[in-house]
Amino acid sequence: MDDDSLDELVARSPGPDGHPQVGPADPAGDFEESSVGSSGDSGDDSDSEHGDGTDGEDEGASEEEDLEDRSGSEDSEDDGETLLEVAGTQGKLEAAGSFNSDDDAESCPICLNAFRDQAVGTPENCAHYFCLDCIVEWSKNANSCPVDRTLFKCICIRAQFGGKILRKIPVENTKASEEEEDPTFCEVCGRSDREDRLLLCDGCDAGYHMECLDPPLQEVPVDEWFCPECAAPGVVLAADAGPVSEEEVSLLLADVVPTTSRLRPRAGRTRAIARTRQSERVRATVNRNRISTARRVQHTPGRLGSSLLDEAIEAVATGLSTAVYQRPLTPRTPARRKRKTRRRKKVPGRKKTPSGPSAKSKSSATRSKKRQHRVKKRRGKKVKSEATTRSRIARTLGLRRPVHSSCIPSVLKPVEPSLGLLRADIGAASLSLFGDPYELDPFDSSEELSANPLSPLSAKRRALSRSALQSHQPVARPVSVGLSRRRLPAAVPEPDLEEEPVPDLLGSILSGQSLLMLGSSDVIIHRDGSLSAKRAAPVSFQRNSGSLSRGEEGFKGCLQPRALPSGSPAQGPSGNRPQSTGLSCQGRSRTPARTAGAPVRLDLPAAPGAVQARNLSNGSVPGFRQSHSPWFNGTNKHTLPLASAASKISSRDSKPPCRSVVPGPPLKPAPRRTDISELPRIPKIRRDDGGGRRDAAPAHGQSIEIPSACISRLTGREGTGQPGRGTRAESEASSRVPREPGVHTGSSRPPAPSSHGSLAPLGPSRGKGVGSTFESFRINIPGNMAHSSQLSSPGFCNTFRPVDDKEQRKENPSPLFSIKKTKQLRSEVYDPSDPTGSDSSAPGSSPERSGPGLLPSEITRTISINSPKAQTVQAVRCVTSYTVESIFGTEPEPPLGPSSAMSKLRGAVAAEGASDTEREEPTESQGLAARLRRPSPPEPWDEEDGASCSTFFGSEERTVTCVTVVEPEAPPSPDVLQAATHRVVELRPPSRSRSTSSSRSRKKAKRKRVSREHGRTRSGTRSESRDRSSRSASPSVGEERPRRQRSKAKSRRSSSDRSSSRERAKRKKAKDKSREHRRGPWGHSRRTSRSRSGSPGSSSYEHYESRKKKKRRSASRPRGRECSPTSSLERLCRHKHQRERSHERPDRKESVAWPRDRRKRRSRSPSSEHRAREHRRPRSREKWPQTRSHSPERKGAVREASPAPLAQGEPGREDLPTRLPALGEAHVSPEVATADKAPLQAPPVLEVAAECEPDDLDLDYGDSVEAGHVFDDFSSDAVFIQLDDMSSPPSPESTDSSPERDFPLKPALPPASLAVAAIQREVSLMHDEDPSQPPPLPEGTQEPHLLRPDAAEKAEAPSSPDVAPAGKEDSPSASGRVQEAARPEEVVSQTPLLRSRALVKRVTWNLQESESSAPAEDRAPRAPLHRPQKPREGAWDMEDVAPTGVRQVFSELPFPSHVLPEPGFPDTDPSQVYSPGLPPAPAQPSSIPPCALVSQPTVQFILQGSLPLVGCGAAQTLAPVPAALTPASEPASQATAASNSEEKTPAPRLAAEKTKKEEYMKKLHMQERAVEEVKLAIKPFYQKREVTKEEYKDILRKAVQKICHSKSGEINPVKVANLVKAYVDKYRHMRRHKKPEAGEEPPTQGAEG
């Protein structure tokens, strides 16, 4: 209101407010105006603070507007000053009565009026009293106590001070419009947010954020505070002279007044709360409201007076009125009249507005000012609301408005998050050694001096602005019910409020503890061992709200955490806990941030087990860190956060220790485990993905892994809930194999990804959806472990979370983990040297990866996901191998309920038999996990996620072998398959060469894997299950039982895992399988596996490749080479199995696919064998539902793998016959066949996929780094290929590529052979069958396919990219969705596909450098660069716009799942497969579905009813290898386009090609835009030298890729900026921790970008 109005109000208001105040009010107004004019903030700010809200209200209610305006609502300064003066006058008048009593009486810290008869409000979490209207007004903009900043959600209303609580009203979280109207901008950072910490200079009213000051203030000063300029000695505002004099007079009078309060200048002058923009606004609003109310009260009939209080309380409670006493209904009429009259006045006044400033006559000036203010406010609103390019650029560059006298824009000081700031953000009181800062008043001397009340005129006058002076005086006194209506009690300065003790010495100690317990991503560990909050979360802040602070710290980025921490520290943890009730874990309080994040996720997963696991993970300090990262993920993706957070928390808290502790489905024990591995992980900030949860789950079987507690994180086998941590630890210790069992625990699984920063989140996010896997994978890049991890996790969580949440997650955490694993597989697919390729263990591809992915030098871990769900069904064992760089500290393990499964897996690592048994045990112990993982679609992804998380955290590379045992409980529960996924993570030194050390690690890992795979291969049924499991980590739950059934095979594999020779053999097999996998959708995965397996050791990998080529049929021999004797045995055993399967398969047309299946089974026995068996034999039929149909099923499997691989697993098995026939019948319409099965599981899968999709999208940027990583992984297969070449160590890459290059040799095979080989490969990929397995030779075509294994491997690389493109475009989520939509079985097949994609992604990264020559080529065609670009978009839009190939597949082929999984492979027609000119096939990845469906059907039919697509994809892959190599160098999109054109020879292909081209152009445009946005966002960091040129390029590439592959398909500058910032943080972190592979990985992503 205008000063005049205010004066009028005052005049009309009760005597105390009388005219005497008008005079001062006017000067105050004038001064305020001048002040405002000069400061541009003071007047406006005050007005905005107090008046803005009222203005909004007034304008909303015009009548009230006038009244309130008059009462000083217009200008907070004017109003505040006037009111303050009035209050002062009142004080003088009432000095004798009011003030004397007031001195001793408690007074409201906000309005400084003594509590008399007004209603009182107290925040629920502290004992500070405020006038009800004051606290209500305050809560509109900040829900923290004005005194101690404690967060509160409810206000307790009391009739009087000390009275009993009448009622509680929830805080209105609606930010007052005041903020928008006339914001005060910080003079340093130029931002107007955080108003409760935006200090207003008492001299010039300029705003400064506490954290922007130098040095930053830890506490909001209660006394006067002067900005640096005003604090300068001798600085006196010219404007202050006049106005201040009047104020000073009133102040002096007030001080002289013979009242205790007045005699105590401090009491009268000292503010009870700091003067911030928030406090000023609230005071102004309250003052305005009270004056208007008082005015109205005058006209209120006496009889109504008594009801005034009640009405006020009621009004406040109902939110009808801003102020308790503001609008009694009766007095409204008079007010309206007056308002109307005044309005008329205002109108002219407004017209005068322009002259108002010049004319300073009291009334006119005041009116003018106020009107002007309104204008200003409106301007402010407009300015604030509109975000122009210039403003955005200026903000990015750190430019802000020029200083008053300057025309050159000043450069803003970037807001450096500080503990104080973080604490403030969460409402935590600032730390003070002396206790309550306000009680002891330990403020800076500068503040004290400026506010020195002893020299009222000198000190005050020198810098106090009118509003500042007023802030020391009470505002208009609230109308008290007891007071006469005509009398407004004079405002009485209130003595310092007794404040709740804030953190004291003990508090600071606790804060330090909180810091120790923060998620690794939240804390920066310095070389000297000291810790500092990375997120600038003040120690006290963190300590204040253990979970809360972490959540906050962890951040705003982590919305969920934030929501959780919204309460006080206690509230944060408890709030979090409630969310993750199932996860209740001591670690929670310790790891609040993560806890907060986790709870949200936990909420999503209805499975308490999973929640518990997560919670447990949270418990440990390292877990805390990890949880933080997951939090980040959570932040990135709220949908994902619940499950993901839970997982992450679990991972964080229950890292490997958690796993150890939890030997069975119970996830809670896992957290205990976390402690052991947490210590080592803490430094690895990237580890806060949610490994805790996984750890919790694996706890039962994790104990075996405990020896590798340190390695837990590296191993990434922490627990199902704590993949990230486990991964790290594992990467540190080669004996991580035991950890696999830990991973085994279903609940823990989701968090597993959180183990390494990114990877850990990957696990949880994987649980969410396929898309997350890559994100996590990306984030796992060595750079910013913590940050990436956090970001990554969300992406995964979101991506898979929806799936998991909807189906599996709610049922049990296992599903999440399963999904994670799938993601992980994808990530790790081609990342032999790129730890980020943790995704390698895609659901279908996982087993295969196991062989190739494991690096001898890497620590081997076995992750088993137990899902008691389908234990009755034949067990399918899936062994997935993939190499993960140490970027991610942990490799998530399937979070299936039974930790025992995990520990068994670990045991299996120690001993084959043990491993097998354990894997089986997990099935039983996974009762909970299975339940959690019930939604079959998510489970495969869980496993993949786990794999993803398995990546090592730092520079070390780790090979993760995923052994998934899928046991269909019974045909009745086709949707949920119990899958036990055992992951063997091999850690290898940063040197990525697959040579000796790598080879050893890989050998060891391979041995483990081999033993696992042997086990898988041993049991036919188990093998099928395995195939399926391997294909889809998610099916791990369902596979749990199959694993048991495959116990022998598993033990074999486990033994292999544990024994280097076996592991080597397994690796070789895995490699072969990988190749075959890569041929098919699973081939993609396989490729990664191989690349992982081989990548780690150059020699190993090369051997592997040659073996793959040579021994695609005899996987055992290549593996033997790599694995040494055991490898040979393993391979031979697998060979036998494969042959058996082959024989069995011949029973079905799928004979051709058998070899691949078997082979895959060897490396990823579960997935490959599973699929193959499902296709090939009755048993395979039984498990077929579990496994993916070759083509449709495979796509479905991939999809399902992501959404409901397990679910599909069972149904798939039962539906297998149908599916095969359907696919065979309608190869062109595999979708139809898939759709048929989709009804069974499609809903869950789709649900999951859908959820994943949104989450991934959400993750896009905010979670952007995480999600972005995932998306990059998912989206840019071709890009990834390039990245692989660039980022992966050349030697490893070359080695990895070697097999891929060998793949081109494959084309030598007869065209039919090639086609069959490709198909087989795909089939094996889809069916978890190792294309390279010799047994698949049964059919003539299959034999060529087997020969093709090398080609398959090569194709696998392309296939992987293809799958990845699908994965990227479809990603786990999109693909899952599409396939899920297609059909449950399709989903099942999608699991492998997704995995394959994951593998592809991994493979691409791993092979990037070497692949550029050949493997890259293959991959490029498989996953055209354009696809990588579009993948994200496509992945998320896959259903409606699958990657070109996928789309084509969908449009041409009804089996989107298959198409997606094998975009690259399906691309080639049987004829194309035959023709060496298959290169077009790579381009066809997008269109491969159509091609595969159209021409491949023949081959597919030959191979397997469902395998067709897979086979086709494989065939394509085979031929495309050369093309792929070419595309590797050229944009994948181009390669894909070219390849597609060629591959689109069939009409469907042509259509696909068109679609692909369109998609490519669309992606290209999007990429261009993304590049521009990313450059804009990263420029400031680059200019500030925060990132090096290389990092700049890497981040650009990665961010662009992520953005291009976001589900939303839009480029949100804000999200881009967040994504870039996350990347920058990650790289910073990587530099800090000297992550050797950070450089490599970023390039990988960069290539994608």
Swiss-Prot record:
GO molecular function list: RNA polymerase binding; zinc ion binding
Taxonomic source organism: Homo sapiens (Human)
UniProt protein name: PHD and RING finger domain-containing protein 1
Domain of life, source organism: Eukaryota
Keywords: Coiled coil, Metal-binding, Phosphoprotein, Zinc, Zinc-finger
Subunit comment: Interacts with POLR2A (via the C-terminal domain).
Biased composition regions of type Low complexity, renumbered to the chain: 354-366, 988-999, 1091-1101, 1284-1297
Biased composition (Basic residues): 334-353, 367-382, 1000-1011, 1043-1053, 1064-1090, 1106-1118
